[in-house]
């Protein structure tokens, strides 16, 4: 079990926005550490990124590892990941980029469209125009496939981002990141462990193109096609969860296994043996 003591380290002050508050976050050398805030975010980050290694995803993604963080007299679970920014690179959220170019809010602009497909196409076209990145619609679709499968309720316009190289003045897609609020990880507020699975499914809402995961996923795949397939098995899921036994109790791991099994059945067209 990896453990790090951060009693004398100040958390990084966040300047972005999240829909459910901020986790404590530190950068030590080239490694980021995030503490669980509402439940088992570290498990979600770790499990989702490890399972993405068994997929056909063509875009880079951040790989997370579990960690126990000692901070101000408490020991809490969380995750760590390498800093993916290279020299001269900046991470620019799409909300910020759109405001810089138009003076308007991207989230409000998207909400003005009546259909999810219109929102997705508009965003893809705008980002290709503003950044020169090609096939941005395919990138968005892969992101939405991951979010639908793993039930990511926190995919807003501030955590979809691009990279900007200040030396070459070129943009590139950001590695996919921020999967902490997947798999009903918020057990403090919306999805307590004793809440039935069907109620959790009814309660969760997607972002940013529709409140329904399948509505925005179907719209994106209709526009840009299916972008990835998963090749992990239920045995792989159980193995990954077993490796997290030192960090999260059995009740949480069993719940997550149940969720993944359910999603594998629902999205069978994304599964490949």
Per-region residue spans from a language model:
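Generic structural hydrophobic/aromatic packing signal, biased to beta-strands
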Residues: 28, 33, 64, 81, ...
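C-terminal catalytic region of ATP-dependent kinase domains
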Residues: 36-37, 53, 167-273
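Conserved ATP-binding subdomain of kinase catalytic cores across diverse folds
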Residues: 1-106
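Short alpha-helical "patches" and their helix-cap loops
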Residues: 62-71, 156-166, 273
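Short helix-capping/linker segments at secondary-structure and domain boundaries
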Residues: 56-59, 154, 270
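Active-site-proximal structural scaffolding
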Residues: 41, 45, 139, 153-156, ...
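Conserved kinase catalytic-core segment
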Residues: 118-185
């Amino acid at each position: 079990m990896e453990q790090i003591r951060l009693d004398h380290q100040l958390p990084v002050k966040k300047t972005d926005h999240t829909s459910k508050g901020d986790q404590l976050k530190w950068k030590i050398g080239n490694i980021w550490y995030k503490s669980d805030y509402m439940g088992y975010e570290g498990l979600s980050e770790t499990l989702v990124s490890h399972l993405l290694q068994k997929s056909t995803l063509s875009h880079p993604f951040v790989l997370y590892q579990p960690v126990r963080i000692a901070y101000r007299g408490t020991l809490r679970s969380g995750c760590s990941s390498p800093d993916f920014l290279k020299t001269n690179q900046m991470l620019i959220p799409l909300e910020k980029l759109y405001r810089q170019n138009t003076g308007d809010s991207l989230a409000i602009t998207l909400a003005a469209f009546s259909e999810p497909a219109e929102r997705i196409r508009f965003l893809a076209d705008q980002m290709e125009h503003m950044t020169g990145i090609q096939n941005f619609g395919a990138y968005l679709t892969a992101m939405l496939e991951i979010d639908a499968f793993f039930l990511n309720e926190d995919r807003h316009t501030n955590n979809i981002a691009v990279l900007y190289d200040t030396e070459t003045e070129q943009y590139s897609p950001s590695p996919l990141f921020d999967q902490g609020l997947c798999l009903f990880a918020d057990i403090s507020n919306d999805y307590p462990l004793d809440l039935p699975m069907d109620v959790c499914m009814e309660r969760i809402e997607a972002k940013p193109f529709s409140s329904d995961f399948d509505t925005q996923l179907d719209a994106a795949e209709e526009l840009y096609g299916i972008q990835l397939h998963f090749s992990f098995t239920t045995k792989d899921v159980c193995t990954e969860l077993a490796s997290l036994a030192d960090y999260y109790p059995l009740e949480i791991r069993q719940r997550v296994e149940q969720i993944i099994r359910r999603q594998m059945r629902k999205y069978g067209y994304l599964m490949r043996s």
